[in-house]
Amino acid sequence: MLVLGIESSCDETAAAVVNDRREILGEVVLSQLDEHRPFGGVVPEIAARSHLAHMDKLVAEAMRRAGVGFADLDAVAATGGPGLIGGVIVGVMTGKAIALAAGKPFLAVNHLEGHALTPRLTHDIAFPYLLLLASGGHCQLLAVEGVGRYTRLGTTIDDAAGEAFDKVAKMAGLGYPGGPAVEAAAQGGDPARFTLPRPMKGKPGCDFSFSGLKNAARLLIESLPQPLSAADQADVARAFQDAVADAMADRVRRGVREMKSRWPQTQHLVVAGGVAANTALRQVLVRIGNETGLEFLAPPLKLCTDNAAMIAWAGLERLRLGQSDDLTFAPRPRWPLDPTARKGAKA
């Protein structure tokens, strides 16, 4: 099987061709970082216009690199949500047009499902597994029971981890995007100088919270001489990164206990999403895996951030089950993975 994937839910425009042997035959990702950096975050209107300007040639380049034509495809998959709706519309309409013209099935892929199934693109693992999905817009602990079968064990009750990284980096003058900037600065930081709170640590359940930590970091930054010296930036970054990793570790340990109780056959703890690229977080998760007897797996760094290979793979997984979507599918700004999510829940 051969599937073209299209991703345009935020600030990466991407296209990829993937086969059922877990091979990425052709892949192109165009980042919009330079367009959004002056604003310190993603501007939806700019993102949508950039997707529209570049999508066609990126699809053509991915197909060229794969050495295939549209007639060779078995299906076309595009992110159908959740995400910034302008960009999602661009990707969905492009995917529909190609599918219609080539006479191929169309699959609207949940962006979160793309992340959730990425470990099966990079590793030969069976269901179920415990997934920590941490990105700029999402922070969830999910029991991945199968394609289209997800149980949310925990979620953020306010801000996502990646959003907190971006805001703290901006307040500390570290630049954008915040995740890599904080991690780079933290490498030279003194872990003993500042201590920030560990939100939700020790509390029942598996939910996350980062709003209070973000505010504590703001108060710390404002208490220091302005503008921050390089040493102060490094120490603040280290304190913040350590707090995030420690708080998330507590939630994940609780998630492992619940996972083993409800799905005792679980063998893997996996992480996906842009925050999964953080080395400190990965080190903590490796330790948790060793402590609990679960094998820790993480996709390569390039597949942690938004990409089209994961969308193609999720589409391929659905296609193998005989699934496809009608061309009347409407793009969705919110689209929770688990069907029992409360109304209004963050996707």
UniProtKB/Swiss-Prot annotation:
Q: Which Pfam families match?
A: TsaD
NCBIfam families referenced in this protein's UniProt entry, alphabetically: gcp_kae1, T6A_TsaD_YgjD
The protein's organism comes out as: Paramagnetospirillum magneticum (strain ATCC 700264 / AMB-1) (Magnetospirillum magneticum)
This entry's Enzyme Commission designation comes to: 2.3.1.234
Residues involved in substrate binding:
L133, A134, S135, G136, G137, D166, G179, N278
Give me the comment on cofactor binding: Binds 1 Fe(2+) ion per subunit.
Q: What class of enzyme is it?
A: transferase
Question: Which InterPro entries does the annotation name?
Answer: ATPase_NBD, Gcp-like_dom, KAE1/TsaD, TsaD
Q: What is this protein called?
A: tRNA N6-adenosine threonylcarbamoyltransferase
Record's function text: Required for the formation of a threonylcarbamoyl group on adenosine at position 37 (t(6)A37) in tRNAs that read codons beginning with adenine. Is involved in the transfer of the threonylcarbamoyl moiety of threonylcarbamoyl-AMP (TC-AMP) to the N6 group of A37, together with TsaE and TsaB. TsaD likely plays a direct catalytic role in this reaction.
Reported cofactor(s): Fe(2+)
- Which gene produces this protein? tsaD
A cellular component term, taken from the record's GO annotations: cytoplasm
The reactions it catalyses are: L-threonylcarbamoyladenylate + adenosine(37) in tRNA = N(6)-L-threonylcarbamoyladenosine(37) in tRNA + AMP + H(+)
Q: Where in the cell is it found?
A: Cytoplasm
The family classification in the record reads: Belongs to the KAE1 / TsaD family.
**Gene Ontology molecular function terms on file:** iron ion binding; N(6)-L-threonylcarbamoyladenine synthase activity
Which ranges does the record mark as transmembrane?
Answer: none
Q: List ligand-binding residues for Fe cation.
A: H111, H115, D306
For this UniProt record, give its keywords in alphabetical order, as a comma-separated list: Acyltransferase, Cytoplasm, Iron, Metal-binding, Transferase, tRNA processing
Which pairs are disulfide-linked? Answer: none
What broad class describes the main subcellular location of this protein?
A: cytoplasm
GO BP, one annotated term:
tRNA threonylcarbamoyladenosine modification
